Amino acid sequence: MDRLFIYKDKLIANSRFQNTVAKIPFLRRIAKKRANQLFDVMAGFVYSQILLACIRLNLFNHLKNGPLTLEAIKNKCGLEQAPLKQLLDAAVSIDLLEIRSNQKFGLGKLGAPLVENSALVAMIEHHTVLYEDLRDPLLLLSGKLKNKKLEKFWPYVSNDLEDQESLKDQDRVKGYSDLMSTSLPLVADQVVSAYDFSKHRCLLDVGGGQGTFLKRVHLQSPRLERMLFDLPGVVNLAAENFLANSEDQSIKVFGGDFFKDDLPSGADLITLIRVIFDHDDERVKILLKSIFKALPTGGKLLIAEPMAETPEHPPMGHAYFGFYLMAMGRGRPRTVEEISHLALHVGFKNIDILHSDMPINAQVLLLST
């Protein structure tokens, strides 16, 4: 079988074979499709910068009430007409915008979901930090890249004592905590749709940031008691935010390091929302053991995050999150099977995969003690 694959690879790599295929109607369609796919991989960074330019000009929100002429968009954005037209044409070509009647520009099928979508917009803007670290991929892969931007953005992944001490400082953690809170609806809505939280008495959200997920769960299950555990600087931010809403003031907050400190007891459900892919296997085992210890018999653990080898979205795991987490300096995307293996190792059982409407945002696992 390997010999057959080697022969196939050599054949496809041969330029004479490629030229011959291009002249045969049936094979030409396949060759064109693969050429287009390869071009999109090569041009992906350019596409991302077109998207970023549209975001920074607030184009999608400008067009939310209907299509506009080039002149009208120019007046709103402040760019000169020629470069603006070039950007608009580029955005049309990748389905961010559409040409409408009378040469007006309207929202495209990929641009419309970005209207007033603070979660996606925050992640698109955040990618400028990631791209700095990806400038030289071999330097990153070799482990020789110094002063990584993502590592500084996420201080909790650093082993530097000064960075670790800074986690008690609200100002130091605010940047990444705000991004997590703003982008969390991408995952939170999927989780709440996948699971009925009202069957539980008390929920502890570990690594719960500023309480965005707990607030979303409250809309579904208002009688559920809520607790939050995160780093000291983060929970101080959360506590301040909770003062603005009387219902949120009932959330109990606990500051600490979930690799070193015991988790609070009393919850019959614990959630990990976009947490474990940030950490290596040994740290994940420590965290899962701590959660298992904190839960009563029959208690539940719900894990939700993007996972490797997600059906219909294979590049999302190993390609996107694999390189993102490598630049970040810790963690890796895991398959459902790998997460299940880690959980079973510490004593969890009855692992169920819950339905997720958008698995590209998160897959959802439910585990029992």
What kind of feature is each model-predicted range?
Residues 116-313, 350, 360-363:
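Conserved adenosyl
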